[in-house]
């Protein structure tokens, strides 16, 4: 214990000697400096699945395209998204302790987080492999893609532990203000994934199995790289293998903050499973169009999620440092920048919808359905901005339960009600996807009201 305390004191002294620009620099510059590495990192992370979709869609067929997206993507997001939500608790805790220069607590949080990743990875692997066929059938997956979908999802979960370790490790690095190295690792692993996709799918004719194998090998590489950096750093977030274990109190703190985000992710995905089931009932062409749309749509989510992660770390460190004025200014600045980026992206996607779809498939009917979806949803993207930025802000100060409830009621529950009541009256793709802008608008209004008048952040800010 004495040795740990001395190390923590030395690491704290090292950090005190460095200026933390997140709590002292120009706000919009710090947000953008943090945002761009996260954006590019998310872009390359999305390329894992996008590369699978493009290569199998172009060289195997629309059934294979449906198998690597659609229901499989939703099920993967259900489990992995729950873990990523839980791990956000570690990011918040570490950013607050790092901002307050409490080295020993940062160390406990880092080692507990990695231990959690290992245990969760084993559990998720077992659940994913055994439950895949049942879950896909429960989603009304068309029979012609049930077999390849099962193969893809089982191989993916066989190597899911690499994904979890990378996400946790990258979250630790971002919590201390390092968003560049996670980007570099993703670039390397993404390029590896593309090369392996070409080799396995085109060269060895392994189909969806080759695409899944390429993905898990590439994710394992990114996990190794992020662990290597954590083990070599001299800062207070240094990882030592012999210290990887659960600290009960720290784990409780991480889960207390992360569980709402994890449950929120599960509720999101559960409602999306219902939507996916409704889409599946419309046939393979619509499933393929929806799968391709989800890849195109990921451009928006990359941008808005990157800003959400940026504001969480910005708020967490400034809140830990007691700088409430910077917290509020940061929120306003982040909202404005996100709105501008969303409008620009929406204009581009709307005007080049056909070209976007032709990257994924040459099937004319799939392209027609896809354009219809894209033209309907893209103009409504702006209605989601407040949800991401304000929920990220509130997570940054540890206020996560009520935002989770707002999302579960405003997005998930309302979405389910819409699908169960409106879709039977008019069962087409536009009726199904209208559930998105409807729920985004309602939930954004609720978040704005909560943030301005009732949130703990507003109460704390008004007292200083």
Where are these regions (language model features)?
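Small-residue-rich hydrophobic transmembrane alpha-helices
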Residues: 65-126, 163-182, 289-353, 384-407, ...
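Short runs within selected transmembrane alpha-helices of multi-pass transporters and secretion channels
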Residues: 87, 155-174, 182-190, 211-226, ...
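Residue-level signal for short hydrophobic patches within transmembrane helices
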Residues: 24, 28-47, 51, 75-82, ...
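Alpha-helical transmembrane segments and their lipid-water interface positions
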Residues: 45, 49-56, 80-87, 91, ...
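Transmembrane helical elements of multi-pass membrane transporters/channels
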Residues: 33-52, 155, 166, 189, ...
